[in-house]
């Protein structure tokens, strides 16, 4: 399982980081946590052997080995999870996160918790539910397949080159 509140703008979460770790570390899973450059993992105290807290690990290194992502619901975290067919527990705090979380619930790929009210028990229960209910995994796999079927970056580059070559402004019809 991978847990992150993002590695850049994650200092405004109060004790949410501690509450989530407290809930997840009681599950019989390996837990990888990233906290960003401004938080020293040692500040979070000793952890059980199955909990690994780092400042930063590339998502691309962690996600292929996960069954669930617990995150703030930022676009990078959500797209990363979905591209790997992983369901999520989302704890949105602001910006794009609440809208991302709402859409993930609509798609059946996530449960959402309130960042102010969520207790360690709530986090543990939500993670257990998503892990145990195969519907979340099936929905995430469906989205993964849709993402994989999209044209790649080569297609986007070709379109941009063509647009740049036309040397005309893009105008929308009135």
Regions found by a protein language model. Name each.
Residues 8-12, 53, 91-95, 114-116:
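Short, contiguous acidic/charged loop-to-helix segments that flank catalytic cores in large enzymes
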Residues 13-16, 100, 152:
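Residues at alpha-helix caps and immediate loop-helix transition turns in enzyme cores, especially N-
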Residues 30-33, 89-90, 111-113:
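Short hydrophobic alpha-helical runs that function as membrane-insertion/retention elements
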Residues 120-174:
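C-terminal amphipathic helix plus adjacent low-complexity
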Residues 55-103:
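A donor-sugar binding/catalytic signature common to diverse glycosyltransferases
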Residues 1-68:
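Donor-nucleotide binding loops and adjacent catalytic segments primarily
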